[in-house]
Amino acid sequence: MKTNTIKNLFFWIFLLFSGSLSAIPSEAEFRKLAETWTLHQDGSQEYRYYKELTLFTHTAMNSTYGQTFITYNPDFQELKIHSAYVKQKDGTTIQTPDNAFVEVLPAGAADAPAYNRLKEMVIVHTGLELGATIYLDYSVISKAGYLPAIDVCKPLEESSPIKEYSLTFNLPA
């Protein structure tokens, strides 16, 4: 009898906490997230990333999503920023200024001289406020032969909900 009471108690505690955790609002929401891998006829590859991210909390603005980090190898890859801007809650569009694109050494390559050629583009999103939406569209284009095949081993690691997610592969005929 005592074990059944303890089991019931744990069950109700679990139910209580699981219900309260789902009621916690997220700090941001991806309205759209799209990833596209394209294999070109010449063997080069293009990875294209597009996101629309609406911010709801100060934590989302200041630490979680205030910057975007893109790692690439400039010897074999080219980074193209197609668009980067913020649309504020009132509809005002703030284009990302040139000085908000900062190229740094990736943190993981700091004590590894063999990887000091890698670059990390830090895009600092400007004009953020509660209710603002970040729009970012970029491509990393790899030269032919750098990547032997399209190898997507990438978990979806977003801590905020995603309304629309698109994963596309374009292959030559």
Describe the function of each predicted region.
Residues 23-173:
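Beta-strand-rich, non-transmembrane domain signature
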Residues 1-10:
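Bacterial N-terminal signal peptides that target proteins for export
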